[in-house]
């Protein structure tokens, strides 16, 4: 049983049985018999009934609307003209137009569209233009196909335009499109407005229960397939322009930026430098990352600039110390600080723990243990407040990790080029290949090299300052050594004189020993040689005479006279000899340092290039 007396479901076609009367006339949607007495609601009648029959004049307005001649209806009866120029909700009205409307009885007529009924209306246009219109019901009905027609719109429609009427409220699932001014006030001024009405749910009893007409959706494809189609299978225009778009997509892929369009129904493909066709790629070599785990080095990456973090290093140390429980035996140290890309910086720390059994000794906490402790979920909020985004343990990769890295090429790098880079590695134990994809990676590598060069320059300046300091200390030490040598010689001479006097005093009146006798003989021979006129004594006498003559000349000219005793002369000779030796030692030291500096200067460019 249906809701309204038929044996079919909603929206199905059926022929209801005729009845002789009832409370509201015939069943809903049926045709009332004219031979029966006029019912109270919705039936046709030949005489004036009490309620709902065909009267001579309508209930609202004796004549037709705005001067048109028509028979006025009651509520739901068959009429010639509605109360306001047409039916209540379902037909297409016109001001002053002669309209003939055929309405069903009850709720199956034009009042609310009926369930399954399709009323038809024949009317004249606004200014005499002939038209034939199928007026849909007001609420479009459940399961009813909305009829499309071509007629001038009523009321406020355009002049001679063509429109398609649609349900007043669209119904469930109907879609209606008009031009500018369509809908309630007609179509576009002077332009035809095309309207397409599609039942959304297809009615109760239809074959479709979906929003709109079901369409076949294309199967989703992967990003790699979309990238390949955007170069090899462009189908946007269907002509030779697709080849031009494909070439443009290929050009964008080679430089690694842009968007590639390949279909009207698919989204464009974003291009990144990691794609396989990007030409701006290279492979360099970097030192093996990380250090020994026992050193305990952990890198803290900050999302702030270096200038904002560097002045607050002590605050960072205090905050980290509080995270470790503020233990007195835990000491936090900063190993280095450097700038990263995208306005970030990195601080490398390590933590020392003093041993309880040996307070003067300490050990470093392992880098992996320190990193795992800082990456706990309970400490993340405090680190985020400090500006730390991640904590990484700077440890050397193990053999498995290194093998996996070398055997699997990075995304967008040709495997053959990656294998060739592995084979060309100058020192596999110290360096690893690193890809440079795009200009951002190249810029970052150049920046890292500049920072490393600055570090080397600072180290060289430090070495130069240390060498200068060592030279000063060496000169001072050399002068002190010479001074000590001079004092040692003086003391040696004094000791020798004391020993001679002591021996002379001790051996007074005793005979000479055979050794002393041999020594005396040698000394006498030496004295005879020196005292010979043609030997050293004669030369010395000649030199002394010349010196006296020169002294006399200086005295005659008013020069100052001077005289040196023998001891002063000996001391002067000794001092001059020491000065000569000191100058020789200093000259040798300077020559050695100059040779060392030449080696450093020649090796500096090679160090910078490496």
From Swiss-Prot:
GO terms for molecular function: structural constituent of nuclear pore. Its main location: nucleus. It is found in: Nucleus, Nuclear pore complex. InterPro entries: Nup54/Nup57/Nup44 (IPR024864), Nup54_alpha-helical_dom (IPR025712), Nup54_C (IPR040985). One of its GO terms (biological process) is NLS-bearing protein import into nucleus. GO terms for cellular component: nuclear pore; nuclear pore central transport channel. Pfam families: Nup54 (PF13874), Nup54_C (PF18437). Sequence repeats lie at residues 4-5, 24-25, 28-29, 41-42, 51-52, 60-61, 66-67, 75-76, 84-85, 89-90, 95-96, 112-113, 115-116, 127-128, 142-143, 159-160, 169-170, 172-173, 180-181, 185-186, 189-190, 201-202, 204-205, 237-238, 324-325. The keyword Nucleus applies. Residues 4-554 are annotated as: 25 X 2 AA repeats of F-G. Component of the nuclear pore complex (NPC), a complex required for the trafficking across the nuclear envelope. Essential for the nuclear import of nuclear localization signal (NLS)-containing proteins in an importin alpha/importin beta-dependent manner. Together with Nup58, required for transposable element silencing regulation in ovarian follicle cells. By interacting with the nuclear (Nxf1/Nxt1) and cytosolic (fs(1)Yb) components of the flamenco (flam) transcripts processing pathway, enables export and subsequent piRNA production. Contains FG repeats. FG repeats are interaction sites for karyopherins (importins, exportins) and form probably an affinity gradient, guiding the transport proteins unidirectionally with their cargo through the NPC. FG repeat regions are highly flexible and lack ordered secondary structure. The overall conservation of FG repeats regarding exact sequence, spacing, and repeat unit length is limited. Component of the nuclear pore complex. Interacts with Nup58. Interacts (via C-terminus) with fs(1)Yb; this interaction occurs in a RNA-independent manner. Interacts with sbr/nxf1. Interacts with Nxt1. Belongs to the NUP54 family. This is Probable nucleoporin Nup54. It comes from Drosophila melanogaster (Fruit fly).
């Amino acid at each position: 049983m249906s809701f309204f007396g038929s044996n079919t479901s909603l929206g199905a076609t059926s022929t209801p049985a005729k009845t002789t009367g009832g409370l509201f006339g015939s069943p809903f949607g049926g045709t009332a018999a004219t031979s029966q007495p006029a019912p109270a609601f919705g039936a046709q009648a030949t005489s004036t009934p009490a309620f709902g029959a065909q009267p001579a004049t309508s209930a609202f307005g004796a004549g037709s609307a705005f001067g048109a001649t028509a028979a006025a209806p009651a509520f739901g009866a068959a009429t010639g003209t509605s109360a306001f120029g047409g039916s209540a909700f379902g037909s297409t009205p016109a001001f002053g137009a002669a309209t003939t409307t055929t309405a069903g009885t009850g709720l199956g007529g034009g009042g609310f569209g009926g369930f399954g009924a399709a009323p038809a209306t024949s009317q004249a246009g606004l200014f005499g233009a002939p038209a034939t219109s199928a007026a849909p019901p007001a609420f479009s009905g459940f399961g009813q196909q909305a009829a499309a027609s071509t007629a001038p719109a009523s009321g406020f429609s355009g002049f001679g335009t063509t429109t398609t009427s649609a349900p007043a409220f669209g119904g469930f699932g109907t879609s209606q499109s008009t031009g500018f001014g369509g809908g309630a006030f007609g179509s576009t001024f002077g332009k035809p407005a095309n309207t397409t009405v599609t039942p959304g749910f297809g009615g109760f009893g239809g074959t479709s229960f979906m929003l709109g007409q079901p369409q076949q959706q294309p199967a989703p494809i992967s990003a790699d397939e979309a990238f390949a189609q955007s170069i090899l299978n462009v189908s946007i225009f269907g002509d030779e322009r697709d080849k031009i778009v494909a070439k443009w997509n290929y050009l964008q892929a080679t430089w690694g930026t842009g968007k590639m369009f390949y279909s009207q129904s698919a989204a464009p493909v974003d291009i990144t430098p990691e794609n396989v066709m990007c030409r701006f790629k290279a492979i360099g070599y970097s030192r093996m990352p990380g250090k020994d785990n026992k050193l305990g080095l952990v890198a803290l990456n900050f999302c702030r600039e270096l200038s904002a973090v560097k002045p607050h290093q002590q605050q960072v140390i205090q905050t980290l110390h509080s995270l470790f429980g503020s233990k007195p035996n835990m000491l936090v140290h900063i190993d280095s600080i450097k700038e990263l890309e995208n306005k970030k910086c990195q601080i490398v720390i390590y933590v020392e723990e003093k041993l309880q059994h040996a307070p003067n000794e300490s050990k470093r906490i392992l880098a992996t243990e320190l990193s795992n402790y800082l990456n706990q979920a309970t400490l993340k909020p405090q680190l985020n407040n400090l500006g730390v985004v991640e904590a990484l343990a700077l440890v050397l990769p193990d053999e498995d990790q290194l093998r996996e890295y070398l055997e699997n090429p990075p995304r967008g790098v040709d495997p053959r080029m990656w294998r060739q880079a592995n084979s060309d590695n100058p020192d596999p134990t110290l360096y690893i290949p690193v890809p440079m994809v795009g200009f951002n990676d190249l810029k970052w590598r150049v920046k890292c090299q500049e920072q490393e060069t600055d570090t080397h320059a600072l180290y060289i300046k430090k070495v130069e300052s240390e060498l200068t300091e060592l030279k000063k200390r060496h000169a001072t030490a050399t002068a002190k050594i010479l001074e000590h040598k001079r004092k040692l010689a003086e003391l040696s001479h004094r000791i020798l004189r004391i020993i001679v006097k002591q021996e002379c005093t001790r051996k007074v009146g005793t005979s000479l020993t055979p050794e002393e006798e041999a020594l005396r003989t040698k000394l006498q021979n030496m004295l005879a040689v020196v005292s010979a006129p043609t030997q050293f004594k004669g030369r010395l006498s000649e030199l002394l005479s010349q010196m006296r003559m020169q002294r006399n000349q200086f005295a005659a000219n008013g020069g100052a006279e001077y005289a040196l005793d023998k001891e002063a002369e000996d001391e002067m000779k000794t001092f001059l000899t020491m000065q000569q030796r000191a100058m020789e030692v200093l000259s040798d030291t300077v020559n050695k340092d100059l040779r060392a500096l030449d080696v450093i200067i020649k090796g500096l460019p090679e160090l910078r290039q490496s």
